[in-house]
Amino acid sequence: MIFFENGFAQPKNSYIAVNTLIARPLAMGGAFLAVDDDLAASLYNPANLGGGSKTRAFSFQLFLNPLTPGLALARREDFYNHSTSASAQAFATLGLLIKGLTLRAGPFEVGAILAEQTTNEIAIAASDLFEVNDYLDNQYSVLALRMRLAERVALGGSLGLYYQSLARKQREWQLRASYGITIAPWPNVLLGVSYLTMPVTPNGGYRNHPERFVNGSVNIGMSFRPYPGTIIAADIRNLVEDENKNEMVREPHFGIEQNLFSVLALRGGAFWKSEDERLAYTLGFGLIDSAKLLLGNPRGALPNWLLNYGAVVEKDNAGQRRWIHALTVGIRI
């Protein structure tokens, strides 16, 4: 769930209610190319799918978002085209509960992200809290594969199916591939490089804001764990771009996360907005690490925060302050 709030006398608000993965990266300034995570990591660097776990034991995990099917039932006109049959709507609604899965076998890890709503600011304009703006016309699914080459080196690639609507109740789709590599020179340091491609529209890129990616860009990142439960991360966006035409240029991103007893994770960060030539600041938190508190921290399991909140505090071109709020709900089983 993402909220766009403008600083005018009558604030404009926009909302995403069905995004599952954005809140944690957003709260950390978007510096996520080398941060351990399950599904969200593969959107920034497919070589980091599943994080830095050293176990090669077989595992299978499902990721659920119970909010999504509830909204689909309550707001069918926003989720589905009028031509969609009732049976197709029922099947799709049930499928919206499952937002992703991961499968690990030896040195290989496969991840799938299912029907994740785009965060493009233009595509998600909405006027009330639970408006979803033609969700199925503006969402994407990603299949990612990670292969661990050695103890501290991994390669990854992903193929994304992206839907976008340039007119109401009309959509087109495109396939895009991305690649990445991670290297851990020391046990508490991880380096990552990714090459990301995504659709481009007349109004901008698919993940241009607040995620700050452009099509055909090379991005680099580093994370450092000075103490257990502490992550310090830094990225440079768009270091090299295939299509450097009036798009964003190189931008530094910084983030930090502090885990407090697996009950609360505090996050903060900042990034440089090249088009406005000013900093944007981020903050957020995670509540209840179910992997440790509810499941006893099974071997190789990454934290799974049941509720994540993230916000960007920025100023627009007119100098007005704006908040971008993100709230996500996710259950891993």
What is the predicted function of each stretch?
Residues F8-I333:
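Subset of outer-membrane beta-barrel
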